[in-house]
Structure formats: structure tokens, C-alpha cells
């Protein structure tokens, strides 16, 4: 049996496909890849906030829906909280480090005033503004290699990236891992997901064999939190769950740059229920602070 995988054509995306493919080969399944151009690729200089939702996934998922591929592979943080009803999560593989990192000569608390940090994420910009209001942020687009090249050529004094991207691309560069209480990561950061057609039972069964259960539970809990509060890759909300045994440890944060709210939860149970509880806690605090009605 051979699985046809749709994915973006970027270097990072191809590495992620091969990570999934390696798991498939271990159970005797071969794979091929179809490279898909997405809106994010076609408008690579536009700020992500202007491109709308689903810019990294829409065209890739359409290839699966149209039968051009069996499954789609994504960085899970890039897929919308509400997946197309004809699609389903077939698998996630074991999570890479979920943290944000700062690539700069000094750590965040020691950076010089008026330092310029490259990031296009509203969440990251707001966390920086809250922690170090005298530091500047500037939009940056392009793949990871391009961003690092811009940093090394002094276009930026620093960058904020996902640690997982550096690890997957095997990039050797010094960085500072950001504390999750200062910089709560985006939901599902560090997770690679496989989406497939809901009715395709044969392919679905294959991917059940490579799913990492604890990672899936963490992913579902984080998505439940975001579903309650409202958010996505253009949202200033961070959420992270870690599962140890039967216990879930979760943290969620919101910042508008002037104030910051952080809530946490620790309990055993169903990931959806626990994630929803954390979302309700954050929503309650946001109402108390007058951020939402």
C-alpha cells in the first residue's frame, strides 16, 4: 500500500512529511508527496493578519477533498480550530518542543531598549510589549532560513520562532527558550498532524498505528481551550497542555500588550472537558478585566 500525501512545498513542510513518512515505513507503508502552493506561499511578503484564516492549509486540504491525495500533513498550529466537516484528524506524531525561542545576543530581559525583534505574530508582539514595552517589533515573513538570514545580516536585532522549527530543520544557532508563563505558546505548537477524508476508513486505520496518544490528548485539550475562548494563529492567546500519566497540566494566557492574564489547571480526565474548563477560566478573567463583554 502507498499513501499519497499533500503538503506545502517548503523545506520545513517536506521535513514534516518525511517525519510522518518514517513512521509509515516502520509499519510497512510507502508514501509519495504532492507539493501544494498555498495563499501564504503566493503572498509571501504580506502580513499574515491581512491574508485571513487558513492561509497555510486551505489549498492543501482541498487536494485531499478532491481526491488528489489521501491525506494532508500540517503543522497543527496552522490549522483552523474548526476543521472542514468532511475531514478528520487521522494522526499526530510525538510532539517536538512546544516552546517559543528568542534568537538574539541577549535574553529577553537583558535586551537593549529600542531593540527590534522580528515576528508577525500578534500573540508574540503583545507578550513582548507587556514584558518589555521599550522594545520594538517588526513584521517578518519568509521561511525559517530566510528569517535567520535577515537576522544574521542585521536587518533585525532578534527573532522569535518556534523551537520545533529549528529542531526539525537541524539548524545550529544559539537561542534563548522563553518561559511558558512569559510566552505561552500557540495552541498545538510543536505538533504535526495528518488530516484525511472522514469516510476513508482504510487509510484512517493505517494512521491509527502511528498516532502518539498523549500528544493527541494535549492537542485536543488545547483546541478545546481555544474553541471556548476564540482564537487561532492570528490571536493573542497562548495555551499549552502537558500530559503526565493521567494528569493534564494546562496554562493559558492572553495579553493586549498593556495587561496580561494567565490561568492554569491541573487534573485528570477527558482532554476536551479539561481544555474547555481552562478556556472558561480564561474567559471569566477576561470578562473581569473588561477585555470581553
From Swiss-Prot:
Transmembrane stretches, start-end: none
Record gene name: hemC
Name by which UniProt lists this protein: Probable porphobilinogen deaminase
Protein family: Belongs to the HMBS family.
Catalytic activity: 4 porphobilinogen + H2O = hydroxymethylbilane + 4 NH4(+)
Pathway: Porphyrin-containing compound metabolism; protoporphyrin-IX biosynthesis; coproporphyrinogen-III from 5-aminolevulinate: step 2/4
Organism: Saccharolobus solfataricus (strain ATCC 35092 / DSM 1617 / JCM 11322 / P2) (Sulfolobus solfataricus)
Keyword Transferase: yes
GO terms for MF: hydroxymethylbilane synthase activity
Amino acid at each position: 500500500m502507498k499513501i499519497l500525501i499533500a503538503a506545502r512545498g517548503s523545506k520545513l513542510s517536506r521535513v514534516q512529511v518525511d517525519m510522518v513518512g518514517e513512521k509509515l515505513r516502520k509499519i510497512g507503508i510507502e508514501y509519495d508527496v504532492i507539493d501544494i502552493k498555498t495563499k501564504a506561499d503566493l503572498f509571501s511578503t504580506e502580513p499574515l493578519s491581512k491574508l485571513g484564516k487558513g492561509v497555510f492549509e486551505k489549498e492543501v486540504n482541498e487536494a485531499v477533498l478532491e481526491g488528489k491525495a489521501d491525506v494532508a500533513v500540517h503543522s497543527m498550529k496552522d490549522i483552523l480550530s474548526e476543521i472542514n466537516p468532511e475531514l478528520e484528524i487521522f494522526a499526530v506524531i510525538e510532539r517536538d518542543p512546544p516552546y517559543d525561542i528568542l534568537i538574539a545576543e541577549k535574553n529577553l530581559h537583558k535586551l537593549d531598549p529600542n531593540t527590534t525583534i522580528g515576528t508577525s505574530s500578534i500573540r508574540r508582539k503583545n507578550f513582548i510589549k507587556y514584558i518589555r514595552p521599550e522594545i520594538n517589533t517588526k513584521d517578518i515573513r519568509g521561511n525559517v532560513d530566510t528569517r535567520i538570514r535577515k537576522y544574521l545580516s542585521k536587518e533585525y536585532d532578534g527573532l522569535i520562532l518556534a523551537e520545533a522549527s529549528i529542531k526539525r530543520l537541524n539548524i545550529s544557532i544559539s537561542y534563548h527558550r522563553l518561559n511558558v508563563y512569559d510566552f505561552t505558546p500557540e495552541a498545538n505548537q510543536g505538533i504535526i498532524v495528518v488530516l484525511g477524508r472522514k469516510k476513508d476508513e482504510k487509510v484512517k486505520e493505517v494512521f491509527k498505528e502511528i498516532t502518539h496518544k498523549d500528544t493527541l490528548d494535549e492537542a485536543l485539550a488545547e483546541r478545546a481551550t481555544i474553541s471556548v475562548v476564540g482564537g487561532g494563529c492570528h490571536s493573542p492567546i497562548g495555551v499549552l497542555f502537558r500530559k503526565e500519566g493521567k494528569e493534564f497540566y494546562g496554562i493559558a494566557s492572553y495579553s493586549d500588550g498593556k495587561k496580561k492574564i494567565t490561568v492554569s489547571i491541573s487534573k485528570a480526565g477527558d482532554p476536551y472537558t479539561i481544555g474547555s474548563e481552562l478556556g472558561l477560566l480564561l474567559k471569566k478573567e477576561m470578562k473581569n478585566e473588561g477585555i470581553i463583554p
